[in-house]
Design a protein with these regions (language model features):
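Active-site pocket-shaping loop/turn-to-helix segments
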Residues: 30-41, 238
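Residues embedded in well-ordered beta-strands within globular domains across many folds
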Residues: 57-59, 259, 282, 483
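Short, surface-exposed connector motifs at secondary-structure boundaries
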Residues: 53, 254-257, 278-281
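Glycine-rich phosphate-binding loops at beta-strand->alpha-helix junctions
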Residues: 62-65, 257-273
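Phosphate/ATP-binding catalytic cores across multiple sugar-kinase/actin-like superfamilies
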Residues: 238-258
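Flexible beta->alpha loop and helix N-cap segments adjacent to enzyme active/binding sites
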Residues: 3-35, 77, 83-85, 90-208, ...
């Protein structure tokens, strides 16, 4: 049996498939080495041909049209936000989607309306039409720290002046299956909230302002308007971000266990605030737009009584070998000696976070790590680096003992890991279980040398590029060394 899910709306296009018991996934950005890349139906068909999938049953995430605002499925076409809900490998009675925008059926002359999220209690949907959280955070671009993003600022001005309609542009993009000259700056707009997530930690929150915004008739729009006419300092950025954390809690009833998805679900600071407020959000690495193909496929799997899958990997280039014990020991020595080391093993991860297959690794005890690693990554100075730690020892270092996908902030409990401790004392960490044997063994060897079972872990890519999906791409990154399978390459760029 061949089942296929397509996620081809606006950005982060992907294809997911079930082929005779095997699960396959490919993301356009990895194939074309263009971040958040959009690729249309022609590309998806070429992938299916490569996979030798013939006459499949196909479901797709899309923007539905019609008169019924509660409609989530039309044949095998799924509402975009409903595809987010369906992307979870587990079924939850309550599901909450917080995203930028989608369009869905509406009882008006256009038979469509824009909305920014979805709350589902059982089978009952409620659309969220409030001003989108990513747009609420947009005024951060006027802060001094983003002075280098002049092109992005002009883009936002065009949106505010209504000389650009993102919805109309997206419809044209899908119709023509071609990106245009606006694409590069649109990609930057997608990444702005993630960069703000790191910057806000340097500011002090004005809780009185947050309370005033929350108690206004239109909280999100009020917060946006008041900050968008100023040149916010880092304290206002922190205040704006804190507002976003709290407004999500205000918008939904307390939910102790729920499925959580959409682009905003990648925000580890907001996720932590939900946890601290008594919520239990269940987030998966593909909970963003890149996982909508998985949601569409899950819709078909449910119909055919096939169990949903949870161990998704990229269909990309893999090494011919696995690292031996000798190679793992050598890599650990390089890390202990403060070398910036690439780690390319198996298939790449699905989702925007590197989890030990496509990673750049470094010594977490080195207080100069950010400057050293940023010679390669070239990221803004305020953005933190994550960590990978042995799961059976994570409780010694972080207040969240199990967190396998870098989707929630933890408080750091140990002072000896400055490389992965953000200015606010937090870390986006990944816990590595013993069954992830190759990566776990590397952490074990690192521990023998630096007394900490941990590495700094950041994705194997350069600024503005997606995570590497070929060995050639990986070798082009100017690292001190890179381990690909069982081979170590040193000083390739000296």
């Amino acid at each position: 049996m061949h089942l296929v899910g397509l996620g081809l709306t606006m950005h982060d296009s992907s294809v997911a498939a079930y082929k005779d018991g095997k699960f396959l996934y490919r993301k356009a950005e990895r194939q074309f080495s263009k971040k958040h890349f959009y690729a249309g139906l022609s590309w998806a068909e070429s992938v299916l041909k490569e996979w030798d999938i013939n006459n499949p049953v196909i479901a797709k995430s899309t923007w539905l049209k019609g008169r019924d605002p509660d409609q989530l499925v039309d044949g095998f076409d799924l509402d975009h936000h409903y595809a987010h809900v369906m992307s979870s490998p587990k079924k939850y009675h309550v599901n909450y989607v917080v995203d930028a925008l989608s369009t869905g059926p509406a009882d008006n002359e256009n038979e469509q309306e824009v909305y920014t999220g979805l709350l589902m209690m059982g089978e009952t949907p409620r659309r969220i039409k409030d001003f989108p959280i990513p747009s609420v955070l947009r005024p951060a671009v006027w802060a001094q720290q983003f002075d280098h993003e002049e092109e992005l600022r002009k883009f936002f001005i065009s949106i505010q002046n209504q000389t650009i309609s993102i919805t109309d542009w997206a419809k044209k993009l899908i119709e023509t299956e071609q990106v245009d000259e606006m694409w590069p700056v649109f990609v930057k707009s997608i990444d702005l909230p993630g960069k703000t997530m790191g910057l806000q930690s340097y500011g002090r929150v004005d809780n009185k302002t947050v309370d005033r915004w929350l108690n206004s008739p239109f909280p999100r729009y009020t917060a946006f308007c008041e900050t968008n006419v100023t040149r916010p300092d880092v304290h206002m950025v922190a205040t704006l971000h804190s507002f976003c954390e709290r407004v999500l809690q205000k918008d939904v009833p307390p939910m102790h266990d729920f499925g959580y998805s959409g682009g905003v679900a990648q925000n580890v600071v907001i996720n932590r605030s939900l946890l601290d407020a008594g919520y239990k959000p269940n987030v998966y690495p593909w909970a963003y737009d890149g996982g909508c193909s998985i949601g569409a496929l899950n819709y078909l799997l449910d119909k055919y009584n096939i169990e949903r899958y949870s161990d998704w990997v990229q269909d990309d280039q893999t090494p011919d070998t696995e690292p031996s014990t000798r190679t793992i020991k050598k890599v650990a020595e390089l890390i202990a000696n403060n070398k910036v080391v690439g780690w390319y093993q198996g298939n790449g991860e699905v989702g925007p976070r590197a989890l030990g297959n496509r990673s750049i690794l470094f010594n977490p005890t080195n207080k100069h790590a950010k400057q050293i690693v940023n010679r390669v990554k070239q990221r803004e100075w305020w953005r933190p680096f994550g960590a990978s730690v042995k799961e059976d020892q994570a409780h010694r270092f972080f207040d969240i003992p199990v967190s396998r996908h870098m989707l929630i902030n933890s408080n750091v409990l140990y002072s000896g890991i400055p490389a992965v401790t953000h200015v606010d004392g937090t870390c986006r960490h990944q816990t590595v279980p013993e069954e992830n044997s190759i990566y776990y063994n590397l952490l074990d060897e690192v521990e023998k040398l630096i007394d900490v079972p941990m590495v700094l872990n950041t994705s194997l890519n350069l600024r503005g590029k997606p995570i590497c999906s070929t060995i050639t791409e990986a070798k082009q990154i100017p690292l001190d060394a890179i381990c690909i399978g069982d081979e170590i390459y040193e000083n390739m760029h000296s």
